[in-house]
Amino acid sequence: MDAILRQMRDGILRDACKLVLVFSNNPKAKGLETAKNAGIPTYCISSQGKNREDFDREVINFLAPLKIDYIILAGYMRLLSPLFIRTYQKRIINIHPADTGAFQGVGAYEWAFKNKLKKTYVTVHYVDEGMDTGDIIEQHELDISEMTTLGEIEKAGLVLEHKMFSEVLKKLFENEQ
């Protein structure tokens, strides 16, 4: 969230889009406080104790009047229901720290480290009804052959994620205009 807000304030996303809301299902999410401090409207609906479809229906009803063009998942760690995905088909974008054909879900950098991979990937993709299986928008390679700790891989991966996500979003939004 920090990286996207910085790019919207001072960087390549400044004139490319307007952030209308930061939403979370977790009232303690750091992104809510970050957005609030930046003057961005925030909203939270707790998902605790709710089934996925009922929760997503509640979120859809909240978002509907906002006429949102895209939903950008940045640290949102809850699987979306088929109802939500169909409602916002090809308008939900996620970033995943791996080749989505090789590894889906959480722990991608740890997986690359444990498997002694020479390279891994960062992938920006549309969200579909599977986990990290949507159409790839863009994918960049991350050379990890000289890295000896998981921390090094995570740090390098995060740098690439922050740079790449903003660049991909800018291209996507410019193609919409």
Language-model regions: role of each:
Residues 43-48, 95:
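Short beta->alpha connector loops at strand-helix junctions that form conserved
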Residues 24-25, 48, 52, 66-82:
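N-terminal glycine-rich "phosphate-gripper" loop used for MgATP/nucleotide binding
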Residues 70, 74-176:
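Donor/substrate-binding cores of folate-linked one-carbon enzymes
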Residues 18-21, 41-43, 91:
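Conserved beta-strand segments of alpha/beta enzyme cores
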Residues 57-66:
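Short, well-structured alpha-helical segments in soluble
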Residues 1-30:
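N-terminal Rossmann-like dinucleotide-binding module
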Residues 3-6, 34-35, 83-86, 106:
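Short amphipathic alpha-helical segments
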Residues 5, 24-42, 66, 70:
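Non-catalytic terminal and connector segments of soluble metabolic enzymes
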